[in-house]
Regions:
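Catalytic cores of TIM-barrel enzymes
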Residues: 1-93, 106-238
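A solvent-exposed, charged loop/short amphipathic helix patch at secondary-structure junctions
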Residues: 91-101
Length: 238
């Protein structure tokens, strides 16, 4: 039905200099130690290099899957989740109140690189970008902080990706999309699929529609689960 890449949340952060190793307990790549101690210690970050490292292998895998006729989903992490793998999360939360301008600067650079990544992903056969930024989920910070800073930055990422790609569909995790709608960053429209489909089957039909560029209020992890609410939620970014 779908093939999902990658198998961890460290691809983007590693491209920005995070030290990643294989976690012996869980058997997945994880940050071995933080590269920086504080937000103010983070220098100018490098550009993502798609010709080397694991990011290259992710894109190569997408091409292989596309050539096999698969529908490919690429998980992509938002700016704050990327930063939380370069510096302790505690420092990120402090920075939300004390260093907003620096976080905006870093996020703007990361956003530009994520847009490049999205373009490369589309070129290599990715059909859906599954976006999340769980470090600054709406239930972890105040509604005002989400609307004025964290949600706004995610909105900028998504608008830029949408503008830079032609056919990729964005899929927002449930927490992100609900918070997005509450904060006024998007509108929602229900798409009613034929009865008896799983979430993945309904999603597969929805992404074929030319008017659908963003979907939310659902979970990619429920691909094989029967539809419970009977609809797919099309989101339109404002």
């Amino acid at each position: 039905m779908f093939c999902k890449l990658p198998f961890c949340v460290t691809i983007e952060a590693e491209a920005f200099g995070a030290e990643v190793s294989l976690n012996s307990l869980y058997g997945v790549p994880a940050v071995a130690r933080f590269r920086y101690e504080r937000v103010e210690d983070i220098p100018a970050l490098p550009e993502m290099d798609f010709s080397t490292g694991r990011v290259r292998e992710v894109l190569r895998a997408a091409t292989i899957l596309r050539d096999m006729g698969e529908t490919v989903i690429l998980n992509i992490e938002g700016p704050f989740t990327v930063l939380s793998q370069l510096v302790p999360s505690k420092q990120i939360y402090k920075g939300l109140y004390r260093q907003q301008e620096r976080l905006r600067e870093l996020s703007a650079w990361i956003t530009a690189q994520l847009v490049r990544y999205a373009r490369e992903a589309e070129r290599h056969g990715v059909n859906v970008l599954s976006y999340a930024d769980p470090t600054v989920a709406a239930d972890l910070i105040s509604p005002k902080l989400y609307a004025d800073l964290c949600g706004e930055i995610s909105y900028e990422v998504l608008k830029a990706v949408e503008a830079a790609t032609e056919n990729i569909v964005l899929h927002l995790c449930n927490k992100t999309s609900v918070a997005f709608q509450k904060a006024g960053f998007c509108t929602m429209e229900r798409i009613i699929p034929q009865p008896g489909l799983t979430y993945g089957e309904a999603l597969l039909e929805a992404i074929k529609r030319l008017d659908v560029r963003c979907i939310g209020h659902g979970c990619i992890q429920r691909t094989y689960c029967p539809m419970t609410n009977g609809c797919i939620y099309k989101l339109t970014l404002k």
